[in-house]
């Protein structure tokens, strides 16, 4: 599979700080057993970035964070 780059993800979430937060939150969800939205055998962090680059996951991840 092709490598994922930050530039691919920045097309979906232009702010790199928000991108890092969204990817971190999604990777934690995947590590805890949530179902991935794309087919991949990669680690949760890579799957999270692939989902963001594909437009499957976005800034809505930050709105789901419990306070």
From Swiss-Prot:
Keyword hit for Metal-binding: no
Q: Which reaction does it catalyse?
A: RNA(n) + a ribonucleoside 5'-triphosphate = RNA(n+1) + diphosphate
Listed under GO cellular component are: DNA-directed RNA polymerase complex
Q: Does the keyword Isomerase apply?
A: no
Gene Ontology MF terms in the entry: DNA binding; DNA-directed RNA polymerase activity
Keyword terms, alphabetized: DNA-directed RNA polymerase, Nucleotidyltransferase, Transcription, Transferase
Return the InterPro entries for the record: DNA-dir_RNA_pol_omega (IPR003716), Pol_omega/Rpo6/RPB6 (IPR006110), RPB6/omega-like_sf (IPR036161)
- Could you mention a single GO BP entry for this protein? DNA-templated transcription
What Enzyme Commission number(s) appear in the record? 2.7.7.6
**Which family does the record claim for this protein?**
Belongs to the RNA polymerase subunit omega family.
Tell me, in a sentence or two, what this protein's role is: Promotes RNA polymerase assembly. Latches the N- and C-terminal regions of the beta' subunit thereby facilitating its interaction with the beta and alpha subunits.
**NCBIfam families in alphabetical order:** rpoZ (TIGR00690)
What is said about its interaction partners and assembly?
The RNAP catalytic core consists of 2 alpha, 1 beta, 1 beta' and 1 omega subunit. When a sigma factor is associated with the core the holoenzyme is formed, which can initiate transcription.
What name is this protein filed under?
DNA-directed RNA polymerase subunit omega
**What lineage is this protein's organism placed in?**
Bacteria, Pseudomonadati, Pseudomonadota, Betaproteobacteria, Burkholderiales
């Amino acid at each position: 599979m092709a490598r994922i780059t930050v530039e691919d993800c920045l097309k979906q979430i232009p702010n790199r700080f928000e991108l890092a937060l969204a990817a971190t939150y999604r990777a934690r969800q995947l590590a805890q057993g949530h179902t991935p939205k794309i087919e991949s055998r990669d680690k949760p962090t890579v799957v999270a970035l692939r989902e963001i680059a594909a437009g499957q996951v976005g800034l809505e991840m930050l709105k789901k964070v419990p306070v």
